[in-house]
Amino acid sequence: MSKKYDAGVKEYRDTYWTPEYVPLDTDLLACFKCTGQEGVPREEVAAAVAAESSTGTWSTVWSELLTDLEFYKGRCYRIEDVPGDKESFYAFIAYPLDLFEEGSITNVLTSLVGNVFGFKALRHLRLEDIRFPMAFIKTCGGPPNGIVVERDRLNKYGRPLLGCTIKPKLGLSGKNYGRVVYECLRGGLDLTKDDENINSQPFQRWRERFEFVAEAVKLAQQETGEVKGHYLNCTATTPEEMYERAEFAKELDMPIIMHDYITGGFTANTGLANWCRKNGMLLHIHRAMHAVIDRHPKHGIHFRVLAKCLRLSGGDQLHTGTVVGKLEGDRQTTLGYIDNLRESFVPEDRTRGNFFDQDWGSMPGVFAVASGGIHVWHMPALLAIFGDDSCLQFGGGTHGHPWGSAAGAAANRVALEACVKARNAGREIEKESRDILMEAAKHSPELAIALETWKEIKFEFDTVDKLDVQ
């Protein structure tokens, strides 16, 4: 063995920098934005990322002789400049598929965004995008139902779904919570939602909430003749408790449940998605904690990666920001990951932040959810940006109506239907937004009051995380 094995430390680029490599269709491809320490060559930084996220360690080890390192190692095959940023660069790395457990997003992320992010040779590291090969996609369950099945279940066609989060999000008793749900649904909303941080607190235990919400949903359905629903948050302390809540929602004949997929974790999320698929339940996904991970432009994980991972792990709806509301997200970037939630094939398009072609095959799509600081004046822009296969959720923009939640719901429903009608008639709804809404308000006092209430409310702040394009 001593004749074959050279102990010691060698540069990462000697093994993991392979610019001559042509990625295979079965490779998982990743794009990292790297910012190395001063004096460390780009090739060494990029190769270190490839090594530490695949087979490498800081020293040569004798046990490399027991496997085929050339087959299993990650390979950095390309380096690119980041437009407008002289200290950072893009490293493109190819990973052989056998490095990952089939269908396990947890395992993929453990490798790609694990210890390598604490590597001292790096000042910053950000996972910008992943190309999942079809051979991996076919091992994932994906959305439990998908867009088409969800529309059939809810009997909603030709427009976005309309919803809201119940406010105040914390502090209501179960009975009062149910009353607010009822007011919103009878006013014209399709769906209402638990806030992401309501689980089972002393002021309102989960079982009490589920029962009062179910009563409210059924009463609103009887009065309106429409299918209604409420996202019952099943996120819990343990997986066992999560499944107990999901089972009870099914017993109550509720159509949809909810999970906080980042705080709850991908293992729990995939398990819950599999349960929903077997039990005919829709699954709404909230992204609480995402901004801790994705907002810094040089370090962390871009949300487009988290969105792709969610589509594979499983969910029928996912929050994506609003572009026009109170939360971070520019238009082109948001459209980029909406494409990856809904389309069967998404081409490389740097203007939308997509670094790779992504073929999703026959995997069902996910509804994009716009929620956060939106009101009736935003309706034309939201419809133009998100299209029909989306869910528009107005929390404060429903409950803040001077006449109450039912009137706020009615105002949003009238505004949405007016915008859809105008779009279908060929009008440019963003340019003509004021005229469209004011015309509709002539026949809806609820909308007229809403337009007056929120006419001065805007969230005009510069985007922190911008696309790296010139």
Swiss-Prot record:
Cofactor(s) annotated in UniProt: Mg(2+)
Site for Transition state stabilizer, residues: 326
InterPro entries: RuBisCO, RuBisCO_lsu_C, RuBisCO_lsu_C_sf, RuBisCO_lsu_fd_N, RuBisCO_lsu_N_sf, RuBisCO_lsuI
GO cellular component entries: carboxysome
Catalytic machinery residues: 167 (proton acceptor), 286 (proton acceptor)
EC numbers for this chain: 4.1.1.39
Top-level enzyme category: lyase
Modified residues (N6-carboxylysine): 193
Keywords: Bacterial microcompartment, Calvin cycle, Carbon dioxide fixation, Carboxysome, Lyase, Magnesium, Metal-binding, Monooxygenase, Oxidoreductase, Photorespiration, Photosynthesis
Protein name in UniProt: Ribulose bisphosphate carboxylase large chain
Organism per entry: Prochlorococcus marinus (strain MIT 9211)
